[in-house]
Amino acid sequence: MKNAPSFLGYSRLAAEITAGKTDQREQFDFSTEHPLPKPGAPLYENLRAPNQWPSETALPGFRDVFTDYMTKMSEMSIAFTSLIAEAMHLPRDAFDKYFDQDQQHKLKIVKYPALSTLDQEAGVEGQGVGPHKDSMLTSYLLQVTNHRGLQVQNVAGTWIDCPPIPGTLVVAIGQALEALTQGVCVSTTHRVLSPSAGSGARLSIPFFQGVRYDAEFDELDEVGVGNVPEDIKEQRRRIIEKNGGRIDDVEF
């Protein structure tokens, strides 16, 4: 990853820190493919760039498979946010303003190594990745291996296991969608615990739906997203009241 200003590429084990602790994971970061930005483009355009793919010799077909997967997930994620808009009694295209024609979306391939036997005997709870919220609109997690470890936090602050179910994706709400829906769609706090000793590595493939880097959120009222119907916001207020006034589930 250090070879590219796009932050796309490979990250070694234990290279990141979340909530003050080292994450025990290694990963590849990819995105829907884009050319290098033109000279004079804003610095944030460096995020839109070609991927650093493994060689075809080392992993035959890898690039084609994941390019196709990102294309299909891109289409599905746009359709999904259209359904969210409809569910909130907004126009189906309420979110379209925030997508480029060639919108960049991102994908990770993540490996979480198992705890060592010594750590497990000492009662260590390994941090695969610490508690956090995704920043984008929505994310879609494919749990590749049959490992527990993914947990989500409910409004009471309790961590709930999210075990893998074959043939399904785990969908999470990101902070951008929470902002666009005036808090009706609450972003999901989640974490991953390291696999138990001897169980092998946990593998997962999260896909992150992006938004335009130059989107202006002060234009909400013009596109309808800012005009969330009062009855929808009232449902959210009732849930907050039911949970003792708690409006943020972050406990880290």
Predicted regions and their residues:
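Peripheral, non-catalytic segments flanking oxidoreductase cores
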Residues: M1-F252
